[in-house]
């Protein structure tokens, strides 16, 4: 659809491969099949990317944007946290995901004109009520029934039956941006006997060095502050 949108003249594709209209890249494209010819009567005033500009590429945490208009899906944080079916236990780039839990907008946020795209001009009471529960700690401790019935229909890039990815993504973000306030949450999660998603291999333990240590006691994992 991006290519079709560009050919139709409603926007352009920039160096990070996202489709941009005059209002930026935070757009959702839909296509309609019709049996009548259309005449394009409005010319867009979109300026192309500057030849030497590489803000989007420099902002990519995993260097997935290898060159202008070239992106490796195997290393894109947005793909790895959603539909690619990644396995955190074997993902070598997990410590570069920063705070991203679902998707990634780093390359879009870096584009200067997108910085003006988010405007608090409308109120969405239902969204505000829901988002107050959508924090890293809330996700980690959430019931799977809530993730399945409330979260997944809205953040559907993670497919049904894979709701555990919300938890692993949130835990990964907590490890990447460790704060002592996370320790009780990690402990509680461990006691829930789902530690296989948290502290399962030596690579994860290395990331916790100097932050959280793991002590195996009575057959369960206990996390504590060093």
How would you name each of these model-derived features?
Residues 84-102, 136-158:
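Short Fe-S-cluster ligation motifs
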Residues 99, 168-172, 187:
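Amphipathic alpha-helical repeat scaffolds
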Residues 147-153, 179-190, 211-219, 224:
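Amphipathic alpha-helical scaffolding segments comprising HEAT/armadillo-like alpha-solenoid repeats
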Residues 158-160, 190-191:
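Alpha-solenoid helical repeat architecture
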């Amino acid at each position: 659809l991006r290519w079709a949108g560009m050919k139709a003249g409603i926007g352009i594709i920039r160096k990070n491969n996202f489709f941009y209209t005059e209002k930026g890249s935070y757009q959702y494209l839909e296509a309609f099949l019709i049996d009548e010819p259309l005449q394009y009567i409005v010319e867009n005033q979109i300026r192309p990317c500057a030849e030497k500009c590489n803000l989007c590429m420099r902002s990519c945490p995993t260097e997935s944007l290898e060159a202008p208009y070239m992106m490796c899906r195997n290393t894109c944080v947005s793909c790895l946290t959603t539909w690619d079916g990644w396995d955190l236990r074997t993902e070598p780039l997990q410590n570069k995901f920063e705070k991203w839990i679902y998707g990634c907008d780093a390359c879009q946020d870096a584009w200067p004109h997108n910085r003006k795209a988010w405007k608090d001009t409308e109120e969405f009471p239902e969204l505000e009520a829901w988002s107050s529960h959508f924090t890293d700690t809330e996700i980690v401790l959430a019931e799977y029934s809530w993730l399945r019935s409330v979260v997944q229909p809205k953040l559907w890039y993670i497919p049904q039956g894979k709701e555990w990815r919300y938890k692993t993504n949130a835990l990964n973000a907590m490890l990447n941006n460790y704060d002592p306030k996370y320790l009780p949450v990690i402990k509680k999660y461990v006691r829930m006997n789902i530690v296989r998603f948290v502290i399962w291999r030596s690579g994860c333990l290395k990331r916790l060095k100097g932050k959280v240590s793991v002590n195996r006691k009575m057959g369960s994992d206990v996390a504590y502050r060093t």
